[in-house]
Amino acid sequence: MNYTTNTITIRPIKEDDLHRLWELSFKDKDPEWKQWDAPYYPHEPMPYEKFLERKDKIVEQDDFWGIEAEGKLIGMVSYYWEHKPSLWLEIGVVIYESAYWSGGYGTKALTMWIEHLFTTMPLVRVGLTTWSGNERMVRVAEKLGMTMEARIRKVRYWNGVYYDSIRMGMLREEWEAHRSK
């Protein structure tokens, strides 16, 4: 299963994607994308062989899909359970290559990802957590119709500055109203 627009496709990761995904995500010690994706958590590069040990958690999984543009992998969308018994699910997106930032790729990918999740799961809500230093991510969530549900002030510390943790969310009925516009 995959979803496609005129510019991108989201789809499960295939074994053929592993080397490219490793290059984008774990090859470098200080990748540029990490400045926006929770930079207050350490990022550890890893050798390709060690990355391959995780392939069973990456290839053809329901919770981790690739974003493809112009025939190549440029990012990923994911989800994790904050609390599975209550179906509290959080989503994420990373566009690894800066050439694809601010081009609508993340917005399109998350639109398709949210549609996929609401279509295939009995969810009542989808959430997204980011930080106040990533203003682009906050804008994407707002464009998608998400509501800022919580702003926990000055709990993220990076490069000598405190930032807020931002929790955005959307109920199924809000998504249905948003997508019908």
Describe the residue ranges of each PLM region.
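Acyl-donor (CoA/ACP) binding surface of acyl/acetyltransferases
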Residues: 1-20, 24-28, 64, 68-181
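Conserved GNAT-fold acetyl-CoA-binding loop/helix
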Residues: 30-53
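Short amphipathic alpha-helical segments and helix-helix/interface helices
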Residues: 52-55, 138
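Short loop/turn motifs at secondary-structure junctions and domain boundaries
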Residues: 55-61, 146
